[in-house]
């Protein structure tokens, strides 16, 4: 089966079912005649921007939605998976991350500077990232975008 067709089937399954595990998704794919390895399924999940959401003690797969965010989908996944909190202070944004992930996020944000003139630079520690923005307004917008992503 071609990849595009498989991706369409995965979209349909995730949209219409509460899937908790990759094994469950793999089983539903098999019921539809789609045999896929766990590694391929993981790549497909990443490609489709599918994330695990938590609600009332349950976790299930859902699509990452960006709204009007200027943050690209790869960076959204980094934010969703690694960020604990974000707060703006003047033209700065202080982002708390999981331990060891601040520098990964800083590199990803630095890569965005060509397309985002509102981000001037970053400084990362082990679990804290400081983003220097062009203005207080830019810092507030970036913080709002991050918080929107974290809410899922």
Curated annotation (Swiss-Prot):
GO cellular component: cytoplasm
Protein name: Arginine repressor
PANTHER family: ARGININE REPRESSOR (PTHR34471:SF1)
Family (UniProt): Belongs to the ArgR family.
Primary location group: cytoplasm
Function (record text): Regulates arginine biosynthesis genes.
Keywords per UniProt: Amino-acid biosynthesis, Arginine biosynthesis, Cytoplasm, DNA-binding, Repressor, Transcription, Transcription regulation
Entry keyword annotation includes Transcription: yes
SUPFAM superfamilies membership: C-terminal domain of arginine repressor, Winged helix' DNA-binding domain
Highest taxon of source: Bacteria
GO terms for MF: arginine binding; DNA binding; DNA-binding transcription factor activity
GO biological process: L-arginine biosynthetic process; protein complex oligomerization; regulation of arginine biosynthetic process
């Amino acid at each position: 089966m071609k990849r595009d067709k498989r991706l369409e089937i995965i979209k349909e399954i995730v949209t219409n079912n509460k899937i908790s595990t990759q094994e469950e998704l793999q089983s539903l794919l098999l019921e539809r005649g789609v045999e896929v390895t766990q590694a391929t399924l993981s790549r497909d999940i990443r490609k489709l921007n599918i994330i695990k959401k938590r609600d009332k003690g349950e976790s299930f797969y859902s699509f990452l939605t960006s709204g009007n965010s200027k943050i690209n989908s790869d960076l959204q996944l980094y934010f969703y998976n690694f960020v604990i909190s974000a707060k703006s202070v003047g033209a700065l944004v202080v982002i708390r991350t999981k331990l060891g992930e601040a520098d990964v996020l800083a590199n990803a944000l630095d890569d965005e500077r060509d397309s985002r003139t509102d981000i001037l630079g970053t400084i990362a520690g082990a679990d804290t990232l400081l983003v220097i923005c062009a203005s207080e307004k830019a810092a507030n917008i970036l913080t709002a975008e991050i918080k929107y992503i974290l809410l899922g």
